[in-house]
């Protein structure tokens, strides 16, 4: 059974094939409908704008029928196990995408389902977002070769998936943030064992210098305890001064929603180097490609 849970579950060639398909679907070179006659469930333990709309539209464009399930529609909170939910949904659906609070929910669902499971986001990773981001970088710079990615702030789920991508595609990744907010040591060790060039620093200027991409995310994610996060993260705000340290054609990226004046200034996110709305659009195309490769028998 093919699932899409983490980037590290795939080899580089397989992910590149998905990116190639995403580009063809976006350009109109691929107008196939590989999900024709298929029903794809969408489970949301956390609400979403981009994930909900991009998957629902994408499933429909590929010829499938989306079936949306919120946490209130399921029995998970009232005693039914994740394992049983996976077994039941397998009798009705051809695949399921889940946006979950805990990564373990996704892995347990996949272990017990007889249909493909796609990770729409968990507390540990966000692989669909990174596929859209990689597509955006290729559009802007032609390829991923020689890319220097600067991540600012929290070593969160999105950062974790960037680490996996760096190990698989071989670009340089610089993670600038407070030491207390660094990504898991085991994940960093795995990536470095794969040959990834990953730099950890508490100096945002050093991380941004000569970077081709500067990326950040909200400082306080949905469900997180704010605590001292905003104070701790303030030195890692994406500003125009920091963008000037990067390459002249560097792009700014953010998975959205963004809080202007916090992790990024309005001048940057609304400026000419910002690619945030290209990223948002590419969620649609990247996820269509993922679904085609994971769900269809013809990819």
Residue ranges and their predicted role:
Residues 249-250, 256-299:
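Adenosine-phosphate binding glycine-rich loop
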Residues 39-40, 44-92:
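Active-site cofactor/substrate anionic-group-binding motifs, chiefly glycine-
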Residues 32, 94-165, 254:
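Anion-binding alpha/beta catalytic cores of soluble intermediary-metabolism enzymes, centered on
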Residues 67-89, 112, 164-165, 183-196:
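Active-site-proximal loop->helix
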Residues 192-267:
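Rossmann-like adenosine-cofactor binding region
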Residues 45-57, 141-216:
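Glycine-rich phosphate/diphosphate-binding loop of Rossmann-like nucleotide-binding domains
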Residues 1-53, 57:
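Positively charged, low-complexity intrinsically disordered leader regions
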């Amino acid at each position: 059974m093919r699932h899409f849970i983490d980037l590290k579950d795939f080899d580089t060639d397989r992910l590149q094939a998905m990116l190639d398909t995403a580009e063809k679907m976006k350009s109109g070179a691929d107008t196939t409908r590989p999900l024709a006659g298929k029903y794809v469930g969408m489970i949301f333990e956390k609400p979403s704008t981009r994930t909900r709309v991009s998957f629902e539209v994408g499933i429909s464009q590929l010829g499938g029928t989306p079936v949306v399930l919120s946490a209130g529609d399921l029995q998970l909170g009232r005693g039914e196990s994740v394992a049983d939910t996976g077994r039941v949904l397998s009798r009705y659906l051809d695949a399921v995408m889940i946006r979950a609070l805990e990564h373990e929910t996704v892995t347990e669902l996949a272990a017990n389902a007889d249909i493909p499971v796609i990770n729409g986001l968990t507390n540990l990773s966000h692989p669909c977002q990174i596929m859209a981001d990689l597509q955006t970088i290729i559009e802007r710079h032609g390829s991923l070769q020689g890319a220097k990615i600067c991540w600012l702030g929290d070593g969160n789920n999105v950062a974790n998936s960037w680490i996996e991508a760096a190990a698989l595609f071989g670009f340089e990744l610089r993670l600038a943030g407070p030491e207390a907010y660094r990504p898991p040591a085991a994940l960093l060790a795995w990536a470095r064992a794969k040959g990834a060039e990953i730099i950890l620093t508490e100096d945002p200027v050093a991380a941004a210098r000569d970077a081709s991409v500067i990326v950040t995310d909200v400082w306080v994610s949905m469900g997180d305890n704010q605590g001292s996060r905003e104070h701790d993260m303030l030195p890692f705000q994406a500003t125009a001064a920091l963008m000037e340290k990067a390459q002249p054609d560097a792009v700014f990226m953010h998975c959205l929603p963004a809080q202007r004046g916090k992790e990024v200034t309005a001048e940057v996110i609304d400026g000419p180097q910002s690619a945030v709305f290209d990223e948002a659009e590419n969620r649609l195309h990247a996820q269509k490609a993922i679904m085609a490769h994971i769900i269809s028998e013809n990819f």
